[in-house]
Amino acid sequence: MVHFVGAGPGAPDLITRRGAALLADADCIIYAGSLVNPALLGLAKPGCAIYNSAEMTLEQVLDTIRAAEKAGGTTVRLHTGDPCLYGAIREQMDALDADGISYDDTPGVSSFCGAAAALCAEYTLPNVSQTVIITRMEGRTPVPEAEQLAKLAAHGATMVIFLSIGLVDKVRQALLESGGYRPDTPAAVVYKATWPEQKVVRCTVSTLAAETRRNGITKTALIVVGDFLGENYERSKLYDPAFTTEFRQGTEAGQ
């Protein structure tokens, strides 16, 4: 049996209870060593075989899983954040399907949630943004034409940009290209969200590249953009005295 497990954004106590239990029971752990906090490996039982997938190809990962299966062991494939975002899990699952190896998936706290926590911010504010775009800048891995960053920026919605801090000049240019964001639209760079060395750099779209360089951030960071980082928003209807819900009768006058 193979368990795909989300390790969470960084802090070891942010893994789910289920994920921690699966780690503690595993006979084999294959973890994404470039981003997963190694402190989580302290949950492994004595004798557990541990492999760093940052040093492996897909074929080597699969061969390691097959060997563990042949020995009757349980494998945890430990991915950073939540495996569903940029986790490259589909190709692994398809190979396991072809081999007849059973697997399941345990979600984790994504780094985009960790970034919001670091900012003490809410991505979806009434009359500001009700949409969150999660994307990346095109690099060695292409993106579909319709999902080019400049085209997505035209929406002006809250945007969280993964895997792109090394292309921050191109990111800045793309964000301004369509006019969806103003030069003074608030932005932030969150380095290693929830880790002890977490760093938050607040800026604007215009100053994004310069502030990133000034703070020496070159990797392991998210870029967040949008007016949700500003001061203006409307009160939520959910807790408005005049708003009737399944659990509470509202008043017309709001008194």
Identify what each model region corresponds to:
Residues 16-17, 34, 126-128, 184, ...:
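Non-catalytic, surface-exposed connector residues within folded enzymatic/regulatory domains
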Residues 84-155, 199-202:
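Class I SAM-dependent methyltransferase SAM-binding "motif I" and its flanking Rossmann-like core
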